[in-house]
Amino acid sequence: MVHQIHVIGGGLAGSEAAWQLAQAGIRVRLSEMRGIEATPAHQTDSLAELVCSNSFRSDDPTNAVGLLHAEMRALGSLIMAKADAHRVPAGSALAVDREGYAEAVTHAVAGHPLIELVRERVDALPADGPVIVATGPLTAAALADSIGAATGADALAFFDAIAPIVHHHSIDMDVAWMASRWDKGETKDYINCPMDKDQYLAFHQALLDGEKTAFKEWEKDTPYFDGCMPIEVMAERGVDTMRYGPMKPVGLDNPRTGRWPYAVVQLRQDNALGTLWNMVGFQTKLKHAEQVRLFRTIPGLGKAEFARLGGLHRNTFIQSPKLLDGALRLKSRPNIRFAGQITGCEGYVESAAIGLLAGRFAAAELLGRPIETPPAATALGALLGHITGGAEADGYQPMNVNFGLFPPLEGAKGGRKRKGDRKAMMAERAGEALKAWMDGGVEPA
């Protein structure tokens, strides 16, 4: 079969992209190296294998990921169809029989008359022709080098140091304040949470005592990225190490005392909307429950709601907000699209969702139809917007879908609405926006 497009990678994103293309009448070559070469993490040769958890997280449509589920179902997602067909009891979450689900995806993709599944390792980006790269966080070294050469990245495999991200509306600004160090610049760019000496010493000890997550076997030989150091490792190096690093208080006058605090935790705006703020320098291997407990002891963050918790793990992804256009094309080589975790989205569902969009966009392009991106008010549109420009390009890190990526509700600020009401209103708005988009768009044949 002479293919019209080459999809590299048979994970969730690549399988979904190939399916969307084939359903639109496009002939696809899908390359997957498992079957001839194993990865350190996968256990089978099945497409769309779930490497870690068997959970697709909440299926509640008033939760951001549950809303993403609903939107993907509406657009004919293969991954969601097979997940639903192999669902196992998990309360309000969508969990699956991982083997049955992956086998079903493999059977559907391999059996599609317009998809040629080829077990092969691709060592370089194809020179021409439409391509979707969906090789995930364990991209083979040779292909990672080729991607690095095409994108200007020096290295793509490293430990990404993920700092926690906090919803702005949950920060207590009666305790914290906005300022830049020494009041430099015309704007006050940081939210500052002050600590006195006793608070700092207690926080330092809690970091030392906190329960950490162990590295996986296949992560142990991967270097840190740019020498990033977990906050608890800084704590281990001395009681004052953090005060001379990310918790340095100099140049930050607390307007309530007129003095510098003993230490300070700074948060920096993380998205263009200003709804998400990251904890500067707080990459960590603390377990998630420990992070929530410990970081809520920081003055001003007592009721913090986290859009993402910190982490440190091996990953391979590109600087998508800088490199990709709004249709997931590489700006320097627009015949190449990226999809899935290699774009910097985090999670099974998010990876499949970006694969779905990449497949639909590529199909529209090949069929000579206009590319219609989903509205920003939808989960698909919010996630796409974050990846392709909504996030800050410098320091870009993987992110799960969350309501902080959506445009704020009009009227009263989100923090003045009850959390459940705000989510329900955003979900309702998203449903209306998706319907209008689908009614006005051209569906695959």
UniProtKB/Swiss-Prot annotation:
HAMAP family, per this entry?
Answer: TrmFO (MF_01037)
Q: Where in the cell is it found?
A: Cytoplasm
Q: What is this protein called?
A: Methylenetetrahydrofolate--tRNA-(uracil-5-)-methyltransferase TrmFO
Q: Which is one Pfam family of this protein?
A: GIDA
Alphabetized GO MF terms? flavin adenine dinucleotide binding; tRNA (uracil(54)-C5)-methyltransferase activity, 5,10-methylenetetrahydrofolate-dependent
**E.C. numbers:** 2.1.1.74
| Superkingdom, natural source | Bacteria
Q: Which organism is it from?
A: Rhizorhabdus wittichii (strain DSM 6014 / CCUG 31198 / JCM 15750 / NBRC 105917 / EY 4224 / RW1) (Sphingomonas wittichii)
**What are the record keywords, sorted?**
Cytoplasm, FAD, Flavoprotein, Methyltransferase, NAD, NADP, Transferase, tRNA processing
Cofactors required: FAD
Q: Which PANTHER family match?
A: GLUCOSE INHIBITED DIVISION PROTEIN A, METHYLENETETRAHYDROFOLATE--TRNA-(URACIL-5-)-METHYLTRANSFERASE TRMFO
InterPro entries from the xrefs?
FAD/NAD-bd_sf, MnmG-rel, MnmG-rel_CS, MnmG_N, TrmFO
Chain residues that bind FAD: G9, G10, G11, L12, A13, G14
Q: Which GO terms describe its biological process?
A: tRNA methylation; tRNA wobble uridine modification
Q: What does this protein do?
A: Catalyzes the folate-dependent formation of 5-methyl-uridine at position 54 (M-5-U54) in all tRNAs.
What family is reported?
A: Belongs to the MnmG family. TrmFO subfamily.
Q: Which GO terms describe its cellular component?
A: cytosol
Q: What is its main location?
A: cytoplasm
| Catalytic function, reaction form | uridine(54) in tRNA + (6R)-5,10-methylene-5,6,7,8-tetrahydrofolate + NADH + H(+) = 5-methyluridine(54) in tRNA + (6S)-5,6,7,8-tetrahydrofolate + NAD(+); uridine(54) in tRNA + (6R)-5,10-methylene-5,6,7,8-tetrahydrofolate + NADPH + H(+) = 5-methyluridine(54) in tRNA + (6S)-5,6,7,8-tetrahydrofolate + NADP(+)
